[in-house]
Amino acid sequence: MIIKPRIRGFICTTTHPVGCEQNVKEQIALTKAQGPIANAPKRVLVVGSSSGYGLSSRITAAFGGGASTIGVFFEKAGTEKKPGTAGWYNSAAFDKFAKEEGLYSKSLNGDAFSNEAKQKTIDLIKEDLGQIDMVVYSLASPVRKMPETGEVIRSSLKPIGETYTATAVDTNKDAIIEASVEPATEQEIKDTVTVMGGEDWELWINALSEAGVLADGCKTVAYSYIGTELTWPIYWDGALGQAKMDLDRAATALNEKLSATGGTANVAVLKSVVTQASSAIPVMPLYIAMVFKKMREEGVHEGCQEQILRMFSQRLYKADGSAAEVDEKNRLRLDDWELREDIQQHCRDLWPQVTTENLKDLTDYVEYKEEFLKLFGFGVDGVDYDADVNPEVNFDVADI
């Protein structure tokens, strides 16, 4: 079939398998160009490995460190009539390129919150790798089905206390609007922590540990975003921030557990990037369009891949073997360049000046839209979008 982008809200409902494969290819090339990562882990599990930072982690581990990788994700395969999800095609492309390099790659597709996912992963590690040296936890799911009860819990992207009103961009109409978001109820806050907090990360590490599949010195990392006062009302000070604070709580508990065998657990605070997750958060697209332009001008812009490469090579697995620098909460900070005072001041000054008319001149909004479409495999250089493509792409993946 010939596949064109179809946008609904902040989701593109179609995906392009060849475009997704080309994206992965580019990320691999970027990783290889950096040269091998010294002291890199050799057996890596990535929970949430099909897009964004999770995919970048798997690519970095495999193509920067030569690691055997297991990826866990929840994606849909394409059919004769309908394309699959971008994450399916990303994972298929990763698997193809890893195997071409002679790297071990296996994937599990299903609900990572489930007990079955954890058990199947443990069985696979025991069978193929024995143990693992690194666990990356990178789930970005809006819902969680509780394994014991089957109850489905939903998260909320809402402020706490009062209605939040701010200048935002309507990405469908390319227009500046006033966005208002009602505050979360106590139950919504609690539910957001249940879905997006640290509990499931703990359940994963505890299950892996009890099964004896964590090697001595195993490191685990989960991803977070803090941002600045421009996004705090909806993010860090909102329901989502409560969940991210719960990740910090989990990291402390897990670090204590793993330190007994020479391991570590850290939250890595990353910069804002264009992902399906961030596009759903009010004000984030406008903020990203602003901050990207300034960071590009300053020569410090990074995408997912550059961020994770820096986390591996300059934080967790440094060439000299020294411990990673952390902040007062034991977090790895990769948002340091974004949070530079000159960059943030620029955004603060610019925010009130942006109008629908000057949006494309004052910010990198055009690039934001391009990056967004690229997530789904569209607008990628070197891809013929008028060519007939097969939406059915198979690879080495087992259903959970």
From Swiss-Prot:
NAD(+) binds at residues 48-53, 74-75, 111-112, 139-140, 244, 273-275. GO terms for molecular function: enoyl-[acyl-carrier-protein] reductase (NADH) activity; NAD binding; trans-2-enoyl-CoA reductase (NADH) activity. Pathway: Lipid metabolism; fatty acid biosynthesis. It catalyses: a 2,3-saturated acyl-[ACP] + NAD(+) = a (2E)-enoyl-[ACP] + NADH + H(+). Substrate binds at Y225. One of its GO terms (biological process) is fatty acid biosynthetic process. The keyword Oxidoreductase applies. Its EC number is 1.3.1.9. The active site is at Y235 (proton donor). Disulfide bonds: none annotated. Keywords: Fatty acid biosynthesis, Fatty acid metabolism, Lipid biosynthesis, Lipid metabolism, NAD, Oxidoreductase. The record marks E75 as: Plays an important role in discriminating NADH against NADPH. Involved in the final reduction of the elongation cycle of fatty acid synthesis (FAS II). Catalyzes the reduction of a carbon-carbon double bond in an enoyl moiety that is covalently linked to an acyl carrier protein (ACP). Belongs to the TER reductase family. HAMAP family: FabV_reductase. Monomer. This is Enoyl-[acyl-carrier-protein] reductase [NADH]. It comes from Aliivibrio fischeri (strain ATCC 700601 / ES114). The gene is fabV.
